[in-house]
Amino acid sequence: MTPRRMLAGATSLFLATVVTWFAGLRVNLSGSMPIGLYRVRSGPPVKGAMVLACLPADVAVFARSRGYVPNGRCPGSTAPIGKVVLAMAGDSVEVTAEGLLLNGRPVRNTRPLALDAGGRSLRRFPDGTYIVAQDEVWLYSPYSTRSFDSRYFGPLHVSSIRSRVLPLWTVE
């Protein structure tokens, strides 16, 4: 391949990425949500919605050091995480060794793991029952038991949610 063709290919890829970004489209390649193309939506979070959220700086630094999240523009220089809103203001979340309970009902696929995929120990959020505050949300992934979510870091402030996302095309 000639240098000119390589430059043309790289330029085309760059322009496609920029156009996609400004069109409000995002590609998800993580296991926390189905792989695919998503449209960014504004508006407040709602229970059950897919969202992009920034982790608190201390959690972000830990997650990045473990390779759970790529670099990005959130605190701790990480990319936002894609998750589903599990609980909102007034909900009761119980954290146990067997998993999360939402308003007294077990939530599937939320048993916390003792070790991550690299065999390193994972510390879960302390066991107990938590009433979600007005300015908090709990996030999880119904798609992956290995997801790094609120089982490990607890609730997030609602301001950490950057956007809602709607799937346009996914591979499950």
What does each of the following model-derived ranges do?
Residues M1-E172:
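Extended hydrophobic leader/signal-anchor segments used for secretion and membrane insertion
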